[in-house]
């Protein structure tokens, strides 16, 4: 989220530095990630990018920065790249494929994020493991393939059971984190 941390992570040899919307909870003191804005994210991406890391800087697109229109999605993704991100990450499954494609159309690489998606914390019933029940596990697996097929170069699997993560990893051609 900041230059000192970025220097440490880069020196440790990390392949990427995710400047996450979790900055809302970790640094800014909010109870969830819904309060962080695109302006906040630009600020933190720029702080990390100014260290000129060899690690890929991933700018997390906050809630409502890619939910309203294609134009907003493109403008917000481009603003994170202008701040120094090499790519962007956005949450959600099949219903976010259009947003992924809009960003890829302007040649910005996209990382996906499924499972526990903190921007949907209220819809998911809180911060808890997703996919423990069979139907929920199927939904997560079904969300992974369209994201990979849409062009995401990697997909974050957050708070899903090991078996579900294995199924997803085995069913798509892109790396899972």
What are these language model-derived features?
Residues 1-177:
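Alpha/beta enzyme core
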